[in-house]
Regions:
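Copper-binding active sites and cupredoxin-like electron-transfer domains
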Residues: 1-164
């Protein structure tokens, strides 16, 4: 067991992953994640989720394509389900923990990006993170997925369930 201490220089969502001699295997086994650093006086959302987008190629001879995963799992129903209620302040943090570029798309909802523009499909690169933060106003079952079609087809998708 190791304990690490640091003084963060800036707020944000920071990805971590293994850098040891077997880092590819260890990352495939799930040795990655995110650390969220908030500003001291930041308003904490009512509901918060962290989604790590990444690929994984099983070590099987002849397998031609990688799984496209969310938090180590692939395909809606197997990936994390984001849950909230109408009226709640929801923050979904999405981070790329592989070497791919991704587009996060959430059906049925829009929010303001860091520049103040309305979006429902922001792009981000390796090691980068974005946040979809909004007041939930549209009940139902909504799909989220990577808008890179090969990633979506490979399983990078999940559900968001909004209760009235």
């Amino acid at each position: 067991t190791y304990t690490y201490e640091c003084i963060p220089e800036s707020a944000g969502l920071w990805a971590y992953h293994d850098h040891g001699p077997n880092h590819t295997l260890n990352t495939a086994r799930g040795l990655f994640g995110a650390v969220l650093i908030r500003e001291r006086d930041a308003k904490i959302p009512d509901v918060e989720s962290v989604l790590c987008f990444h690929s994984w190629t099983p070590p099987v001879t002849g397998l031609q394509r990688a799984y496209q995963c969310v938090n180590g799992r692939a395909f809606a129903g197997n990936t994390p389900t984001v849950r909230a209620k109408v009226g709640q302040d929801l923050a979904i943090h999405i981070v790329g923990v592989d070497d791919n570029f991704h587009d996060f798309h959430l059906h049925g909802h829009r929010w303001l990006d860091a520049a103040g523009d309305v979006t429902d499909n922001p792009s981000f690169g390796p090691g980068q993170s974005i946040v979809a933060r909004f007041t939930v106003d549209n009940p139902g079952r909504w799909l989220y997925h990577c808008h890179v079609l090969a990633h979506q087809d490979g399983g990078m998708a999940g559900w968001m369930l909004i209760d009235p």
